[in-house]
Amino acid sequence: MKAIRRIAGSLTAAAYLAGGGLPAVAEEERSETGSLLGRVQTVYPEWFKESFLEFADDVQEAADEGRRVVIFFHQDGCPYCNALVERNLSQKHIEEKMRRHFDVIALNLRGDRDVVSVNGTAYSEKDFARALNVQFTPTLLFLDESGKVVLRLNGYVPPEEFEIALDYAEPGSEPGVGYREYLENRLRPSQTGSLNDAPFFDEPPHDLSDSIQSGKPVAVFFEQRDCPSCDTLHREVLDDPQTIAAISPFHAVQLDMWSDTALVTPAGQEVTARGWAEQLGVRYAPTIVLFSADGDEVIRSEAVFKRFHTQSLFDYVAGGAYRQESDFQRFLTDRATAMRAQGQDVDIWK
């Protein structure tokens, strides 16, 4: 809670005599630290596995019982982790499926416990997360009976998509196709309707190599028709003036991830939207892929993110912070701290 401001009458009078008046009050308000909102502590299910964190043993034990291991990275106060537990795992059929087919092992993104990877390498929790390039929480890694990652979810996805992920990764599923094709077969993307529009989207035809030549970063929004998550992104995040300002340094384009729309990639390749999405491994709608002014992919959003995290993604690339700080979570912390130091409240769940 913000400290109660006290402005003594004599100081107020002195400010007015000095010609400061209202600006003096405004300066004092700006000196206060803003609040950090939206953090929520999560009680993780008691049926998560209590592991010695030697993953080769965990994989073997799970395989012996006809299950697979899921490594679940979380962090303290993470509202997206809380959503996974309270919105997804709270649904009886999802909980039953998870418990029947998987041993879930929770790791703290910033934790110091000792872990041993499947190949025998020792790490702390946080170093293991860094080695795996975990940039978001929750991140879930589904391991097969040999310890190979068969599916990775980077961030929170809604219950329907989450359950499809469980079906794909469960023991014995043997889908015979990649997860992208599996999702397409399960969800049957609509061929009718239209994509959500936004004022910052460039009109086709798209030659993204031109943007790179002009030294401008590129933001590619892969979406689909009849997409509730896309609707939510546009309504609650992309329509916000601060989000629009954060996107303004970018050449932003919107692509139907299943369409045959022709384009030229930042690297100069002529391809269709569908073909490029497949090359990039885009599976979730909406996915936002951010490219530097050099044409290299820096980071992507392929899960549900609200305003603060979405705006931070664009700031991370446009401001060049990724060149000095490879850990996006640390960048988030630094950005929130800087905003609060200027007196702004930061709500990470808005």
What are these regions, as identified by a protein language model?
Residues 16-23:
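C-terminal segment of classical bacterial N-terminal signal peptides
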Residues 103-105, 251-253:
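A fold-wide structural signal in alpha/beta-hydrolase
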